[in-house]
Regions:
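Generic C-terminus detector
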Residues: 368-372, 376-427
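Short acidic-hydrophobic, aromatic-tinged amphipathic segments that line or gate anion-handling sites
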Residues: 43-50, 121-125, 157
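A conserved helix-loop-beta module that forms one wall/lid of the active-site cleft
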Residues: 90-153
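ATP-binding N-terminal substructure of ATP-dependent carboxylate-amine bond-forming enzymes
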Residues: 1-94
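Internal nucleotide-binding/catalytic subdomain
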Residues: 153-294
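Active-site "cap" helix and flanking loop/linker of ATP-utilizing ligase/carboxylase catalytic domains
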Residues: 247-269, 286-358, 370-371
Length: 427
C-alpha cells in the first residue's frame, strides 16, 4: 500500500516509524514532513492545511490510505475532502473534529450526556466573563480559548488579577485570534492528569496505553503551558479499576453521544483526564494522536498499526485484538531556548548520525530541517528522545543518558520528566 501521513512533527515521525513495520506498507510519504522524517519517508512539499494539495497529490500518486495527524486540517475538513475523492483515511470528519475544535461544543456535549467534567460557564463577552469570575471568587480558576491554540489556549489563573489578564489576552488582544471569540471559564480540579489515546471506529473504543504529559515549560511544573515537554507510559496512577470506570462513564458515553448527535467519530480520540478524589473527569478532548504522548505510546504497540487504522476506517475494530508491550517508555523533549514564547532557530544540532538518530534511543524529529548534510533547529520543540525499558526508571535513565549526547545552541529541556510517576501517591 502507498500511504501518506499529513503533518510535520514528532508525532508524525512516531506514526511513520510504527507504520513502517507493517508488511502492507510499501511506500510512505509525508506532507510536508521534516528533516528527520526524510530518513523514514519520502517528504513532499506543501502545507498540512492545504486540502486541495493533499487531495491532488493523493490522486496523482495513487495513494491508498491517508493519515491526517494534526488538529487543524481535521477541523478544516481534510478527511471529508479525501473521502469524497474516494480515498481511505484515518481521522475524523470535520463535524466530529469539532470535539477538539470547539471547547464550548465539547463542554456542552458532556453536560447534555452526563459525562463527568468540571463545572463551567461559556462567554462571548469579556466584561460578562470578568464579572462572573469576580462573583464566583474561586481560585485557581481555569480560562480556556474556545478554538484551536496549539495546546497553549488554557490559562490557570491564581487570583482575580491574573484571571482578568487572561480574559483580556484571549478575548480582547486576540492572543489566539478567532479561537478566542468565545471562552470557557471552569472550576479548577485537584488531582492527577492522565492522557489516554483511543482508537475508535464510531462504535467500538480500544484505548491505548495510558501516559503522563508534562505541559509546563520548566522543572517542577513551572513556566508557561507548552505543547508538551515530555511523557512517560504507562501512567502508574491509571489503574485497571480506573480504566474500567473511564470506559463505562467517559469513553463509550462520548462515542455514543457523538453518534447520537449525528457526528460519528472515527480515528484517534484523545481523552485528557483528571483523576480526582471523586473519580475521573474529562479536562479536554483532542481529535487526534497527542504530541508527545504518541512518542511513548506507539513504541509499546506490538500489533500492526496500519491494520488497526484500516479497521478503524472500515468499522471492523471490534474484531481486532491489539497487543501491547509490558515495558515502560519515556520521552524527553529538547526545545529551543525561550519556547513557547520567543526563540531563535537555524542552529546546528550535534550528536546525531546521518539518519538523525542517536545511539541508545529513538529520536523523533519535530522542529528540524536538513541543510548541507547537517540537521538544524527549525521550531520550538526540536527533538523527542525516547527510550523503552523493563521499568520506568530504566527507560528514564536511558533517555536522559541519550540526551547528554545531543546539543545545540540554547537547548532547553526538563530534568524531571516522570518524577511524579516514580513515586505515585495514592488517592
Amino acid at each position: 500500500m502507498k500511504i501518506l501521513v499529513v503533518g510535520s512533527g514528532g508525532r508524525e515521525h512516531a506514526i511513520i516509524r510504527a507504520l513502517k513495520k507493517s508488511p502492507k506498507a510499501e511506500t510512505i510519504y509525508a506532507l510536508p514532513g521534516n528533516g528527520g522524517i526524510a530518513a523514514d519517508a519520502i517528504c513532499v512539499e506543501g502545507s498540512a492545511t492545504d486540502i486541495d494539495r493533499v487531495v491532488s497529490f493523493s490522486k496523482d500518486n495513487g495513494i491508498d490510505f491517508v493519515v491526517v495527524a494534526p488538529d487543524n486540517p481535521l477541523v478544516l475538513g481534510m478527511v471529508d475532502a479525501l473521502n469524497e475523492a474516494g480515498i481511505a483515511t484515518f481521522g475524523p470528519r470535520a463535524n466530529a473534529a469539532i470535539l477538539e475544535g470547539s471547547k464550548v461544543f465539547s463542554k456542552n456535549l458532556m453536560k447534555k450526556y452526563g459525562i463527568p467534567t468540571a463545572r463551567y460557564e461559556t462567554f462571548d463577552d469579556a466584561h460578562a466573563a470578568v464579572a462572573y469570575i469576580e462573583k464566583m471568587n474561586e481560585y485557581p480558576v481555569v480560562i480556556k480559548a474556545d478554538g484551536l491554540a496549539l495546546g497553549k489556549g488554557v490559562i490557570i489563573a491564581q487570583n482575580f488579577a491574573e484571571a482578568q489578564d487572561a480574559v483580556k489576552s484571549i478575548m480582547e488582544d486576540k492572543a489566539f485570534g478567532a479561537s478566542g471569540n468565545h471562552i470557557v471559564v471552569e472550576q479548577f480540579l485537584e488531582g492527577v492528569e492522565v492522557s489516554v489515546l483511543a482508537f475508535t471506529d464510531s462504535k467500538t473504543v480500544k484505548p491505548m496505553i495510558s501516559s503522563m504529559d508534562h505541559k509546563r515549560a520548566n522543572d517542577n511544573d513551572e513556566g508557561p503551558n507548552t505543547g508538551g515537554m515530555g511523557t512517560i507510559a504507562p501512567n502508574p496512577y491509571y489503574t485497571d479499576v480506573i480504566a474500567a470506570e473511564c470506559m463505562e462513564k467517559i469513553f463509550l458515553p462520548t462515542i455514543r453521544a457523538m453518534e447520537q448527535e449525528g457526528r460519528p467519530f472515527k480515528g484517534c480520540l484523545y481523552f485528557g483526564l483528571m483523576l480526582t478524589k471523586n473519580g475521573p473527569y474529562v479536562i479536554e478532548y483532542n481529535c487526534r494522536f497527542g504530541d508527545p504522548e504518541t512518542q511513548v505510546v506507539l513504541p509499546l504497540l506490538e500489533s500492526d498499526l496500519l491494520e488497526i487504522m484500516l479497521a478503524t476506517y472500515h468499522e471492523t475494530l471490534a474484531d481486532m485484538e491489539i497487543r501491547w508491550s509490558d515495558k515502560s517508555a519515556a520521552c524527553v523533549i529538547l526545545a529551543s531556548g525561550g519556547y513557547p514564547v520567543k526563540y531563535q532557530t537555524g542552529y546546528e544540532i550535534h550528536g546525531l548520525d546521518a539518519d538523525g538518530q542517536c545511539e541508545g534511543a529513538v529520536v523523533y524529529h519535530a522542529g528540524t530541517k536538513q541543510s548541507d548534510g547537517k540537521y538544524l533547529t527549525a521550531g520550538g520543540r526540536v527533538l523527542g528522545v525516547t527510550c523503552t525499558g523493563d521499568t520506568l526508571e530504566l527507560a528514564l535513565e536511558a533517555a536522559y543518558k541519550a540526551v547528554k549526547n545531543i546539543s545545540f545552541t540554547d537547548m532547553h529541556y526538563r530534568h524531571d520528566i516522570g518524577k511524579k510517576a516514580l513515586s505515585p501517591e495514592k488517592f
